[in-house]
Structure formats: C-alpha cells, structure tokens
C-alpha cells in the first residue's frame, strides 16, 4: 500500500462505515494522464448498484473537501467480486483454506509471483502452501493479493 492509499484509507473508512458498509480496501491506479481511485466495499447482505452509488456520493463529498489527490482521476466503487482483493490480515484469516494469487514487492526465493492455499495468519505474516511447500510472507511485502475463484 502506498502512502497515498494509506492516507485515503484512513480518511474514507469512517464515512464508508457510516453508510453501513465495510471498506474492504482501495487502489489508486496511475495510468498516464488518467488515474483511477477504486474503492471496494462489502456488506453481509451483498452489494448492489444502489449501495455503490450511495458510497460514491458519500466518498465524493469527503474527497471534494479534503482534496488529497493532486491529479485528475475517476472514482469507482464496487464489490470485491469473485477475484476478491485481500488487503488486511483479517481478510486472509477470513479466507483460510482458499486459493490465492500473490504478487510481492520484494522477491522471496527469487520469485515475486506466488499461487497457493492460505494456511494461516500470525500477526502481520501469512503462511501459504505453494506447490506442496509452506511459504511465509510479510503483509508489508505483498503488493497485490487476490482470491482465485473456483468454478
């Protein structure tokens, strides 16, 4: 998570929760002249378009006042979807036993990309069984992690 993403998460968590939804996480994606702030929300009863619109309206008001982003960007609010991104230790705990794809910031055993089954979570470290071998990754070293859906 970048410094901006951390700042945005801290700024937006309370307003999102005030609408009755969980802020799963967010990504700020820079792509040349066009950037995107993607916010993932969830609720025990699921997410629909009205929920996304409600949270988008709330978040837009906060962003307009605080103005933390200095470049032009689009705001997207969505459910985490089938390939749910994992941001926090609690997310990994929730999905122990599920398959995950992980991209690391710094290589472990000369690899940055890993796929495996989430085995356990211990504080800020997760254990994943990859190709029959258990590997441990610090959450601070994970650039991106997504569940791999089973069909």
Curated annotation (Swiss-Prot):
Keywords: Cytoplasm, Ribosome biogenesis. It is found in: Cytoplasm. GO terms for cellular component: cytosol. The keyword Cytoplasm applies. InterPro entries: Ribosome_maturation_RimP, RimP_C, RimP_C_sf, RimP_N, RimP_N_sf. The keyword Cytoplasm applies. GO terms for biological process: ribosomal small subunit assembly; translation. Required for maturation of 30S ribosomal subunits. Belongs to the RimP family. This is Ribosome maturation factor RimP. It comes from Vibrio campbellii (strain ATCC BAA-1116). The lineage of its organism: Bacteria, Pseudomonadati, Pseudomonadota, Gammaproteobacteria, Vibrionales.
């Amino acid at each position: 998570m970048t410094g901006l993403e951390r700042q945005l998460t801290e700024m937006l968590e309370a307003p999102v929760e005030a609408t009755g939804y969980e802020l799963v996480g967010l990504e700020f994606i820079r792509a040349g002249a066009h950037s995107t702030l993607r916010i993932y929300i969830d609720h025990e009863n699921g997410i629909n378009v009205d929920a996304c619109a409600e949270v988008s309206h709330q978040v837009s008001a906060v962003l307009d006042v605080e103005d933390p982003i200095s470049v032009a960007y689009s705001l997207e609010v969505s459910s985490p979807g089938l390939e749910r991104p994992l941001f926090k230790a609690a997310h990994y705990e929730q999905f122990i036993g599920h398959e995950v794809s992980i991209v690391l910031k710094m290589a472990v055993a000369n690899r940055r990309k890993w796929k495996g089954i989430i085995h356990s979570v211990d504080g800020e470290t997760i254990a994943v069984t990859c190709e029959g071998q258990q590997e441990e990754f610090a959450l601070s070293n994970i650039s991106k992690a997504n569940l791999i859906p089973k069909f």
